[in-house]
């Protein structure tokens, strides 16, 4: 309910999860939320009073769930400037087009508008891996025993959920900060 207000007035960021399997989104949502809260708490550090900390916690990124192509595109069109990452299934309802390749179609849709958006493509269908990776997105098999660990790693590596790393023009790390006060 508050997403439109938070994005428009407070410039809050958005993470999009595209998944039609209740089993998987019921597992992913708590994982994503836990990572968000950990990142927010880590960034807050020790400074600030309780009101400031509560405000920062409220301003954390919002996770939006889409269970079909139309919902996913609507969210992307509406919040495109604030999307910091997309987690998409390979197969989900896609009115008028193939359900089996909906995830690939969504990746192409996102990249045609926002080429730098980090995208994690997950599927049980290993046949989609090569094409997903050829589009420059990370592929995870949904039955990987380390799936949740790899999702958390993706958030750190690609979405900035880790230390702030300052690099030289050559790409070498010159400094690192774990909190805003560092």
PLM region spans:
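CheY-like receiver
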Residues: 2-30, 159-182
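C-terminal output helix
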Residues: 1, 27, 128-133, 143-159, ...
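Conserved acidic segment of CheY-like receiver
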Residues: 11-23, 28-52, 63-65
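Short acidic-hydrophobic, aromatic-tinged amphipathic segments that line or gate anion-handling sites
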Residues: 64-67, 139-146
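Active-site residues of response regulator receiver
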Residues: 87-96
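Acidic, metal-coordinating helix/loop segments flanking the phosphotransfer/catalytic sites
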Residues: 43-85
């Amino acid at each position: 309910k508050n997403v439109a207000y938070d994005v428009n007035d407070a410039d809050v960021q958005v993470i999009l999860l595209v998944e039609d399997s209740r089993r998987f989104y019921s597992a992913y949502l708590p994982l994503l939320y836990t990572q968000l809260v950990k990142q927010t708490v880590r960034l807050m550090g020790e400074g600030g009073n309780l009101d400031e900390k509560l405000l920062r916690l409220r301003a954390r990124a919002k996770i939006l769930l889409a269970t079909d192509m139309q919902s996913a595109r609507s969210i992307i069109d509406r919040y495109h400037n604030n999307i910091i990452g997309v987690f998409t299934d390979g197969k989900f309802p896609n009115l008028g087009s193939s359900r089996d390749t909906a995830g690939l179609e969504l990746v192409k849709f996102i990249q045609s508008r926002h080429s730098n958006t980090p995208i994690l493509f997950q599927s049980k269908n290993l046949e989609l891996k090569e094409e997903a990776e050829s589009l420059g997105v990370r592929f995870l098999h949904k039955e990987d025993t380390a799936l949740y660990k790899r999702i958390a790693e993706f958030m750190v590596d690609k979405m900035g959920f880790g230390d702030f790393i300052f690099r030289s023009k050559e790409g070498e790390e010159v400094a690192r900060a774990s909190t805003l006060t560092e």
